[in-house]
Amino acid sequence: MLNPIVRKFQYGQHTVTLETGMMARQATAAVMVSMDDTAVFVTVVGQKKAKPGQDFFPLTVNYQERTYAAGKIPGGFFRREGRPSEGETLIARLIDRPVRPLFPEGFVNEVQVIATVVSVNPQVNPDIVAMIGASAALSLSGIPFNGPIGAARVGYINDQYVLNPTQEELKSSKLDLVVAGTEAAVLMVESEAELLSEDQMLGAVVFGHEQQQIVIQNINDLVKEAGKPRWDWQPEAVNEALNARVAALAESRLSDAYRITDKQERYAQVDVIKSETIATLVAEDETLDANELGEILHAIEKNVVRSRVLAGEPRIDGREKDMIRGLDVRTGVLPRTHGSALFTRGETQALVTATLGTARDAQNIDELMGERTDSFLFHYNFPPYSVGETGMVGSPKRREIGHGRLAKRGVLAVMPTIDEFPYTVRVVSEITESNGSSSMASVCGASLALMDAGVPVKAAVAGIAMGLVKEGDNFVVLSDILGDEDHLGDMDFKVAGSRDGISALQMDIKIEGITKEIMQVALNQAKGARLHILGVMEQAINAPRGDISEFAPRIHTIKINPDKIKDVIGKGGSVIRALTEETGTTIEIEDDGTVKIAATDGDKAQHAIRRIEEITAEIEVGRIYNGKVTRIVDFGAFVAIGGGKEGLVHISQIADKRVEKVTDYLQMGQEVPVKVLEVDRQGRVRLSIKEATEQTPSAAAPEAPVAEQGE
């Protein structure tokens, strides 16, 4: 018999249900979590034994959305779900980031978390539900995991924090912040904001952490009722004698190496020290494991860097804790792009371009929550040469997708609306050098490139990465961290914004015990760094260019009667296709009659506008037009009068005398003046050549051909 164990609780305006014991009973743990009809099924499987020689923690998080959850059938030839979308990849990272630090050091058994969205309420985003499910499943599994964690989304509407706002509420929110943490401390923050202050952002983090305690309590209660026994896992005993021997050989040399400011030179020296130390020790004792020795050396490296920072000594590259690396800012570096910038901060460099396109270039995204169109695209590329390595080049990896999304969040708050600037904008950041915080360099470069392209951004934005070293109550916050400081420190804290406030905040914390005070210090220090960078950027370009690039399409907007849209499009799109070919422009028509004509040449755009105005012009009864005969029938002729419209000239209206045969007076393609006699209810037009000729004596009336005289 299936005996599900269920916990139900109120979480803000939503009801959350945790259920286990019903499905996937061969998995290490499985939980179905639902929040007001959005349901995510999360499983965890952990291997009891680690693979021989395993020297890292192989945690995999897969998040997958099934279209049946929204009552849809997938598109595409195969009619089934394929590779993860960008959105699914971002949510998988969102789950991974707060749970990864909670596994004990030295635990290298393979663990896989799979979250499957099986039902979706369009107003309730599945990401928070999936995070709660992953926390519950890991806590139930018995795997050594120092959780559970809670997760909350925080909005800011009418100067009030809102817990887990609906999709509709988020449209009017100045903040979209996701926070996850344990009972004692915050572990992860991901957010975008409309230039809120440091205090407002910190308040949101604290609010979200306080509110999610009910999630942690209910998961703990579920574990008491249905949890599996804790695995009897113990870290390997520390070999103090070996640690001391390695330290004696390498510590002072590593300390000297970490005073080398050039990254590549430092890495080369550290590699030499490590390989020589391992070779010496293995020569003394062949039973020693090179991987174990490598881990000891890494711990020594970490201690060298951290102890120096905590003692108030200069950092790896000689800077003080709040110093920013040297900046070099250039715009307009590529001649044919619409906008470009090269932003260099120390050994981190981003070549960023901005490209303008039409509404047709916008990305149509079909998500589980519904369809949407994105007219601001941000792509981040991290080639292997940026860190002096060789490697695969191809489709973007999870990290590139995540960094691109963070950089996009940083810029989004200052972008103009589609009504203010009717272009699709694509920003591409090519990381050409990397030694820490390439995503924040991308924010700075994007701001510069957008201004260079003439995009009317509301303000310049800059980003900075902060780090933390903490031992006991002693802590130091570092500004503009290097890659090594990120790797060896306790926190990665990225802040982007303008002079007026924060547009994006991302925080990943590797230890427990990060207090509100520490976050306050980090935010305030980040503000000073951000303002310094903005000052340097403003020396290069302090406002958007007055005009867009000569190579960018210029969009001209006109309005037509919505009833005339069908005339401009034509049967099967024939008229609009002919127009685009004739004028060399791109033409887009919206349902409300807004017509956007895009062209790199102003004359071509004006030609297209004139032609559209001709097509959509109302036919005036009594007006005389110049027409062209398009068709001849027994009872008259059809004459085109411009704008794709034609009318009938009845045989009685061709001449002021009796006409026996139409072809005696008119030929195909002949140009004739015509007067509009009537437009009936069905839009049919009655024309007269006879009356047009009478009113305009100078117009040549068609005459019957004179019969040839026989010789």
From Swiss-Prot:
Catalysed reactions listed for this entry: RNA(n+1) + phosphate = RNA(n) + a ribonucleoside 5'-diphosphate
Localization (cell): Cytoplasm
Keywords from the UniProt entry: Cytoplasm, Magnesium, Metal-binding, Nucleotidyltransferase, RNA-binding, Transferase
Span of domain KH: 553-612
Top-level division of the source organism's lineage: Bacteria
InterPro entries reported in the protein's UniProt record: ExoRNase_PH_dom1, ExoRNase_PH_dom2, ExoRNase_PH_dom2_sf, KH_dom, KH_dom_type_1, KH_dom_type_1_sf, NA-bd_OB-fold, PNPase
Biased segments, Low complexity type: 699-711
Region called Disordered, residue ranges: 691-711
A GO BP annotation: mRNA catabolic process
CDD domains for the chain: KH-I_PNPase (cd02393), RNase_PH_PNPase_1 (cd11363), RNase_PH_PNPase_2 (cd11364), S1_PNPase (cd04472)
Cofactor: Mg(2+)
List of residues binding Mg(2+): 486, 492
Transmembrane residue ranges: none
Coarse class of the protein's main subcellular location: cytoplasm
Domain S1 motif: from-to ranges: 622-690
UniProt-listed SMART domains: KH, S1
MF (Gene Ontology): 3'-5'-RNA exonuclease activity; magnesium ion binding; polyribonucleotide nucleotidyltransferase activity; RNA binding
EC number: 2.7.7.8
GO cellular component, one term: cytosol
Physiological role: Involved in mRNA degradation. Catalyzes the phosphorolysis of single-stranded polyribonucleotides processively in the 3'- to 5'-direction.
Quaternary structure (record): Component of the RNA degradosome, which is a multiprotein complex involved in RNA processing and mRNA degradation.
Family: Belongs to the polyribonucleotide nucleotidyltransferase family.
HAMAP family named among the record's database cross-references: PNPase
Protein name: Polyribonucleotide nucleotidyltransferase
Species this chain originates from: Klebsiella pneumoniae (strain 342)
Lineage summary: Bacteria, Pseudomonadati, Pseudomonadota, Gammaproteobacteria, Enterobacterales
